[in-house]
Amino acid sequence: MGKKAVHFGGGNIGRGFVGEFLHESGYEVVFVDVMDNVIDALNKHSSYTVTEISEEGEQQKVITNYRAINSKHNLDDVIKEISTADVVTCAVGPNILKFIAPPIAKGIDTRTLSKPLAVIACENAIGATDTLHGFIKENTDEARLPSLYSRAQFANSAIDRIVPTQDLGSGLNVKIEKFYEWVVEKTPFGDVGHPDIKDIHWVDNLEPYIERKLFTVNTGHATAAYYGYSAGKKTIHDALRDDRIRKEVNAALAETSRLIVEKHGISPEEQARYVSSIITRISNPHLEDIVQRVGRAPLRKLSRKERFIGPASQLAERGHTVTALMDAVEQALKFQNVPDDEESFELFKILKENSAADATTKLTGLEKEHPLYSRVLEKVDKVQKETK
């Protein structure tokens, strides 16, 4: 019997990153989604193409050996697939984890295989597998909880690969940058050993990798997007050609680098090289990376542990002054009423209907006692006054 992986999320990251890795590692991939058009297309076509983009050109890979199930209509089939799978992964967005947990919990509970299921969430969030794990426990009978870990093991991961805006009419095919990093903690797998997935970097301590990635790649990418949007730029490449915006992005990453170096013991030289490589990657003219796409979901990106408030709050707690990150927060607060982005409309509503103090806490989760609170409050108040 061959290896099988169940992957929740048939979107570009699911097909173009996680699906590619699983396919190249010899897994049959069962995609699970609620989007009828995605599931129908996956079941209609026996292959799709992943085009890897770099400054040297393009390389194509054909992905086969997959099936797809619509969890909206065929949840029992999803549960059955999980009960006999080797790996479950997901790329659905942190807010959707609570919805995929019940079928995963039921699939785990009905397992009879001797080897535990490996569960790895592939989200742009710190501790996403821990979050999913918590929801799975909530959906598991209390009497079965003591034996849960004989049936499943849960490992956090950090993923890094830019998926630009896709061409109209591309269908299942995905364009994606050639660079990738998928780091997964190996400790949870213990003596059983981690699953055999090609090109994953298995580590004992994930936190330095995930914070370095989130507070460099995601912070830099979003900073460029929000400044670019305010300046009327179309793509991240266009934004970073503007010296003023490039300077602001570098300033924000200088602040996050200070935290990464202090907290995780990464050398300043190594972090500087990492920052330089990130700026080069997100500046790639071959990635048609639209600022509205990168900036979308501002409520999530302004939240407590995310790419701006996460590092800024830790720096403030360490007694450091935070300036560039607060300027980036100001730009993010201006990302309002953007077409096809529900959160940007909600951001406008929150800023309009709440006091600066209430909006600050609602948006960032910061309490008044926190050393960063007053700095964020200033930015919220300023943007509120400018947009009245």
UniProtKB/Swiss-Prot annotation:
Q: Which Gene3D superfamilies match?
A: N-(1-d-carboxylethyl)-l-norvaline Dehydrogenase, domain 2, NAD(P)-binding Rossmann-like Domain
Binding residues for NAD(+), per the UniProt record?
A: A5, V6, H7, F8, G9, G10, G11, N12, I13, G14, R15, G16
Active-site residues?
A: K213
One GO CC term of this entry? cytosol
The GO annotation for biological process reads: mannitol catabolic process
Top-level taxon of the source organism: Eukaryota
Keywords (alphabetical) are: NAD, Oxidoreductase
Q: What's the catalysed reaction? A: D-mannitol 1-phosphate + NAD(+) = beta-D-fructose 6-phosphate + NADH + H(+)
- Give the enzyme's EC designation: 1.1.1.17
Q: How does it assemble?
A: Monomer.
UniProt record similarity statement? Belongs to the mannitol dehydrogenase family.
What's the protein name?
Mannitol-1-phosphate 5-dehydrogenase
What is the phylogenetic placement of the source species in the record? Eukaryota, Fungi, Dikarya, Ascomycota, Pezizomycotina
